[in-house]
Amino acid sequence: MERMTAWVHGFVQGVGFRWWTRARALELGLVGYAANQKDGRVLVIAEGPRDKLETLLTLLRSGDTPGAVDLVVEQWDSARGDLTGFVER
């Protein structure tokens, strides 16, 4: 199990982006959250199998999200196991 931290840049607040991300993550069986940041980005923290996390990352970059994603910067770590469900924050 791994942990992906993704900073999503672009027009991603107030457009249903966190809800959409939550729905995709739950479909993939991931746990974590999506949270608006004061600077306009959305922070996505997700844990699960690497292949499922990579699928979520591909979806975040797909151009089929609500709003408009300009850039996604990700970081990989070992899963901490401290998350349950997938929520919008």
Curated annotation (Swiss-Prot):
The UniProt record lists the Acylphosphatase-like domain at 3-89
KW Hydrolase (keyword) present: yes
- Indicate yes or no for the key word Hydrolase: yes
Entry superkingdom? Bacteria
Q: Which residues form the active site?
A: R18, N36
| Enzyme Commission number, as recorded | 3.6.1.7
* Pfam families associated with the record: Acylphosphatase
Q: Which residues pair up as cystines? A: none
EC top class named in words: hydrolase
- Cleaved signal peptide residues: none
Q: Name one GO molecular function term.
A: acylphosphatase activity
Q: What InterPro entries does this protein map onto?
A: Acylphosphatase, Acylphosphatase-like_dom, Acylphosphatase-like_dom_sf, Acylphosphatase_CS
Keywords recorded for this protein, A-Z: Hydrolase
Catalytic activity reads: an acyl phosphate + H2O = a carboxylate + phosphate + H(+)
Family named by the database record: Belongs to the acylphosphatase family.
Query: What name is this protein filed under?
Result: Acylphosphatase
Q: What is the organism of origin for this protein? A: Rhodococcus jostii (strain RHA1)
